[in-house]
Amino acid sequence: MNIPQRQFSNEEVNRCYLRWQHLRNEHGMNAPSVPEFIYLTKVLQFAAKQRQELQMQRQQQGISGSQQNIVPNSSDQAELPNNASSHISASASPHLAPNMQLNGNETFSTSAHQSPIMQTQMPLNSNGGNNMLPQRQSSVGSLNATNFSPTPANNGENAAEKPDNSNHNNLNLNNSELQPQNRSLQEHNIQDSNVMPGSQINSPMPQQAQMQQAQFQAQQAQQAQQAQQAQQAQARLQQGRRLPMTMFTAEQSELLKAQITSLKCLVNRKPIPFEFQAVIQKSINHPPDFKRMLLSLSEFARRRQPTDQNNQSNLNGGNNTQQPGTNSHYNNTNTDNVSGLTRNAPLDSKDENFASVSPAGPSSVHNAKNGTLDKNSQTVSGTPITQTESKKEENETISNVAKTAPNSNKTHTEQNNPPKPQKPVPLNVLQDQYKEGIKVVDIDDPDMMVDSFTMPNISHSNIDYQTLLANSDHAKFTIEPGVLPVGIDTHTATDIYQTLIALNLDTTVNDCLDKLLNDECTESTRENALYDYYALQLLPLQKAVRGHVLQFEWHQNSLLTNTHPNFLSKIRNINVQDALLTNQLYKNHELLKLERKKTEAVARLKSMNKSAINQYNRRQDKKNKRLKFGHRLIATHTNLERDEQKRAEKKAKERLQALKANDEEAYIKLLDQTKDTRITHLLRQTNAFLDSLTRAVKDQQKYTKEMIDSHIKEASEEVDDLSMVPKMKDEEYDDDDDNSNVDYYNVAHRIKEDIKKQPSILVGGTLKDYQIKGLQWMVSLFNNHLNGILADEMGLGKTIQTISLLTYLYEMKNIRGPYLVIVPLSTLSNWSSEFAKWAPTLRTISFKGSPNERKAKQAKIRAGEFDVVLTTFEYIIKERALLSKVKWVHMIIDEGHRMKNAQSKLSLTLNTHYHADYRLILTGTPLQNNLPELWALLNFVLPKIFNSVKSFDEWFNTPFANTGGQDKIELSEEETLLVIRRLHKVLRPFLLRRLKKDVEKELPDKVEKVVKCKMSALQQIMYQQMLKYRRLFIGDQNNKKMVGLRGFNNQIMQLKKICNHPFVFEEVEDQINPTRETNDDIWRVAGKFELLDRILPKLKATGHRVLIFFQMTQIMDIMEDFLRYINIKYLRLDGHTKSDERSELLRLFNAPDSEYLCFILSTRAGGLGLNLQTADTVIIFDTDWNPHQDLQAQDRAHRIGQKNEVRILRLITTNSVEEVILERAYKKLDIDGKVIQAGKFDNKSTSEEQEALLRSLLDAEEERRKKRESGVEEEEELKDSEINEILARNDEEMAVLTRMDEDRSKKEEELGVKSRLLEKSELPDIYSRDIGAELKREESESAAVYNGRGARERKTATYNDNMSEEQWLRQFEVSDDEKNDKQARKQRTKKEDKSEAIDGNGEIKGENIDADNDGPRINNISAEDRADTDLAMNDDDFLSKKRKAGRPRGRPKKVKLEGSENSEPPALESSPVTGDNSPSEDFMDIPKPRTAGKTSVKSARTSTRGRGRGRGRGRGRGRGRGRPPKARNGLDYVRTPAAATSPIDIREKVAKQALDLYHFALNYENEAGRKLSDIFLSKPSKALYPDYYMIIKYPVAFDNINTHIETLAYNSLKETLQDFHLIFSNARIYNTEGSVVYEDSLELEKVVTKKYCEIMGDNSQLDFTEFDEQYGTRPLVLPPVVTSSVAESFTDEADSSMTEASV
């Protein structure tokens, strides 16, 4: 194509260049072969040639006003190959808009949008000859010329002018660079180049300058020629060096070249040359030292700074513009000076606005030294000049070049610098300074730089509105139509904006470098500066990338023209397909329009919906804001309230601390500040109560004194005998009445007497210090006529302190008595021995025993031949007629907590009938339950002080009850502590309590360990059966059918039995051990026994003696068999042990060389008053519900006299009900520490609590089952090493125990023992059956039997497993039974009998049966399975005849076998026995041979069971409501002749034989000559022994046998022998083993059986099994009875002894 021969515009050149670059990138190496690329190359070369020629033409012409500043490139050029050259921007194109007037002060921005022609660059020749410097002009006309910045050409460095914008790349039209091999390098240079503001184009010369142009035109041309010659010379000089002045080193230049070449290779997908790889790898291996580079750069910048300041003046220039109404005048003579001043005027760095000054006379310049204008100078208006980015880069380049410039250039620059303009001053100041020849020109342009200014004269008066409008005075206010204001130069504004950005960047770079080089900056500051510096260095690259992206965007958005190759092909013709396609496109277009409309409609609906939603959300937001504000408001008030509460709590804590520290003064002061009305009320109440108590103390002292005085007057002794008793005058009481600040304690203990030593007649030993203090306290009470409570902890010697008091009164006070000491039966022998040991001088009578024994002692008491009487609680009531007649000086009650019930018979008897001057209570547990019980003790000893239980209880429990509120107000901690403190104040004078840890430092420690025992497989199965089904399941040996044992209403009690030993249930023992022989099964079936099998031999080997406490006597029976089996000697003490026998047992066990290792005791019987300190190990076999019972038991060994450390082992079955019992026991112990409880505290639990307990046990069992199924291991068994650590006291014992373990392990390995406990595989098959499936099958069978009627709904009854303290006390308030008492109580009337009917709550009301003298005292004790327990007497029974009765004792529970329900009863004809009830009733209750109850020791031995272990007797359960059921025991045993089947003659013969046998038994005497049959002649009296008929099913006696003989009722002599056997078996069931009746029955049966064999002539073994199963030697069933309160622990002993009853 031909190139048009015309001048190309800037836009055309830019468009051609972009297309040329696109083709080069698209075709790569093939670009030169593309025609379009060739054509564009020629066009660009032609345009470059045109611009070069134009520029040369302008330089040759030297026309003023058309010169342009040649701005060197500020960026250092990299060293290029030989053909490379620097780029210089061409001059601005003259083809600008013809009507555009450009001032010399205006900069023309060559941005991408304007596309100026100056963006094209032309290559310079090798010597840089084209780089011409502008000529200096000295003519006046230069005022309107563009300012030139001189560019030194030192060292021949090639500089170039660059446009301002970097968005488009500069053109490089050098032919050498159009080659492919140099193309990538040229692109890199273009992208990295910074585009600076371009040259400024001058406007046409003003008219004033043309007048003088001719004068200096020749001079100007001459100067331009000289400058060109100097430049060419300098270029030739630098050509020899060829080392451009650059900031890069040779290595850096080489690295840059390698990087650029590598980049080109990567872009073109070519391999990188090896030499470039080596250079790059070297730079990686040796990274540059950035600190050194920064230091070098800083030094470079510092050296550059002076040159920049010198060259700054060349950047500013001013053009004279003709202002309206102003004419510029120039003086020809001063043209040069003015021209120099204008051209070289420096630009102030702080002020961007300059005023053009027009000189007015010859003295236009005042002084060049101070830079001020002459007086005759004239101000010329001009436009402000803004320092742009191009100027800044120009300064940097000039500075770089000026470093090597000759000194002559610096001197020349300094000489041509004009004086700096000064800031404007007020006009009057300027006139004063230049008084002559000054001419002032008014300037209204605020942008002009002026010399002076005037302030407008503002009038302070009112301004008329008309003056603001146009009028003749103010012509300038007139608006002239058609005259437009001067427009805004947008190009200049853009240039200024870009210049400011460049300045800010440059300033930021300098600041970063300063921070990096400043060592004083912190590390973080320098690090941030380094980051900023790197970011700013990336700015050129970012601009280049942006330009590259924009060029492609422009190309993509441009329309294709014919210049593209796509249009070079031939245009094809239109056919039908095109029409169809067009039609289809049209339809698609219409469809799109329709869719667009639909879319717009949907969008409009969505917009409306969105608008509605937004409106709704705004309303919700407003609402939420209001709510949040309300919440914040509430939160604010809450915080304020919390802060106030914190302040109150802080004050309360301070008061509490003061109260705990006993700082009463500080507490009162803090309380006054708080003004707490509740505590103030409490204090007032406390003070009032203490005042009343103080007066009551005085009343009590007067009362005691009056009693003593009356006693003295009535007594026959002389008054001198009591002369030693301190007497208190009445005046002493009256004097203190007026003193309101009397100390409460000092009033009680007014008279003080120090005691230094014990009485001389106290000879048993030496009292300890704390015992001396106790004696002194008791003597102080005696001196002040007061009574008290000695409440020392168990084991601190209360007995000895009491004896010391009596001996002190006897010796020091000369008071010979009489003294009454009331003690429990179990401790009577201990008291007697202590008196004999410590006070033999005192004449002591132990008033107890049979009536005959007491009669002998009654005479001594009546005669007064005694000093001290020891008796029990029972004889206080029974022998009231005798003992109440004596006027006792001192009454001492041991175990005084039995006086808790103020309405008991004992308390009423003592208060009403007994006279005692002084009273003293001994107790180790004064506070067990609640405050009324404590009040009962205080009321007994101090009746005048504590006379109202109501006021006392209200005072401590509900102090705010009378403050007007109806709800119960709980006490806070502070109030509770305050109440406790005042309680201590009340009790301190009258109650003395010391703990062993406080006073007895030498007493060895007591260490308690809870030992967990695993269950055997049998225990686990039984436990789950009882827990889930409330019954146990055994196998019927006859039909191999599973049979369930019923009647276990008290489920928790049965669970405790299972945990202790499964053989408590005889049916289970028959399944596991049918022979009843003692073997390893006795300890393998129970985890506790297995543990004892390991522990007891170790204790025996190490010489430690053991006390084992039990709750159930049945377990004690099994324990006896176990101890005999492992060959350990033992002693046993339970409720059946008599008082005399107890003393003997204690003596045997405490003997120095005692052979007994173990002492097994019942917790209730053996836990009081026993001194067993020779034992140092205590084993609590099963935990009591009342923890104080266990504490009492522990202190049997841990007491004064103990030399060894006491180890307490509490056996607890793992995962059982025993863990719950232990937890509750610990909770009950908290009351001792707290003293006060919120509300009443008792030991009763409701049925809901019982059900909750069972539910918790079921849930726990279910959790354990899940764990077992999931494979989680249960708790491991206690290891032998752990047991040894518990038992061993030292290392030697540890070695012995370890050796024993090893020996036992070897023995078990030899025997092949795999598990010590019984495993499931060793159990009978019945225990492997699925009980649930069996029960479902039985239910289906029973439903079929009843034909769908279903069974009767069983009413659920819940039973408490707790017993109140009152019920527990019953066992303690009775002495031992009397065998020889003959007097009987009156029988109850029929009305009283009727009163025993069951009430609506399932409780039987009635009066307990008691015997005054002769008969036994029978009391219904609320406990289950108490077979061998003491009789407990309830004193409350004497108050009312309709009080709640306890449960009858002695019989086992009624147990039904499931298999016996459908069995047929025996025929009436086959039974020789008839009774009051119908035969069907009698026999329907007789189960099959396997029984569920227990047999006694006697029965077991008689039936040859193989082990002489007795079974405890229990009690039955009642229905709970309705009429009492018929009695199923106590039936008449009658043999009628009508039932006899033998002929009459045979019966007559049998009657003769039976009569001989009867007379033999009737007249038989033992070796002592005593007839044994007396007690068996008739049945016991129902009035005296009602429980006999409740226990024995068929009572029978010798009278019945005689009647049967007389009526010929016997078919054979064996039936007579069976009746004798029934008599003796009944006696052994009712009476205890070892009693007289028991032994007589054995002896009589033996001789009667022998006589029978002689008569019959047959010595074969007799079998009474079938007879025993039917007629009474089997466990019988009690009538259903429900008591008011159920025993808490349901233990098997009640600590009472039974009197042998005649049968």
UniProtKB/Swiss-Prot annotation:
Gene Ontology BP term (one): positive regulation of invasive growth in response to glucose limitation
Ranges annotated as biased composition (Low complexity): 57-68, 84-98, 166-176, 309-327
Keyword check for Acyltransferase: no
Motif range (DEGH box): 894-897
One Gene Ontology MF term: histone H4 reader activity
Domain Bromo: 1542-1655
Domain Helicase C-terminal: from-to ranges: 1091-1254
Domain QLQ: 247-282
Biased composition (Basic residues): 1441-1454, 1504-1526
Residues recorded as bearing Phosphoserine in the entry: 358, 716, 1340
Domain of life, per lineage: Eukaryota
UniProt keyword annotations, A-Z: Activator, ATP-binding, Bromodomain, Helicase, Hydrolase, Isopeptide bond, Nucleotide-binding, Nucleus, Phosphoprotein, Repeat, Transcription, Transcription regulation, Ubl conjugation
Chain positions of cross-link Glycyl lysine isopeptide (Lys-Gly) (interchain with G-Cter in ubiquitin): 543
Region (Disordered): 57-176, 193-212, 305-426, 1338-1531
Subunit-structure text: Component of the SWI/SNF global transcription activator complex. The 1.14 MDa SWI/SNF complex is composed of 11 different subunits: one copy each of SWI1, SNF2/SWI2, SNF5, SNF12/SWP73, ARP7/SWP61, ARP9/SWP59; two copies each of SWI3, SNF6, SNF11, SWP82; and three copies of TAF14/SWP29.
Role of this protein: Involved in transcriptional activation. Catalytic component of the SWI/SNF complex, an ATP-dependent chromatin-remodeling complex, which is required for the positive and negative regulation of gene expression of a large number of genes. It changes chromatin structure by altering DNA-histone contacts within a nucleosome, leading eventually to a change in nucleosome position, thus facilitating or repressing binding of gene-specific transcription factors.
Annotated protein name in UniProt: Transcription regulatory protein SNF2
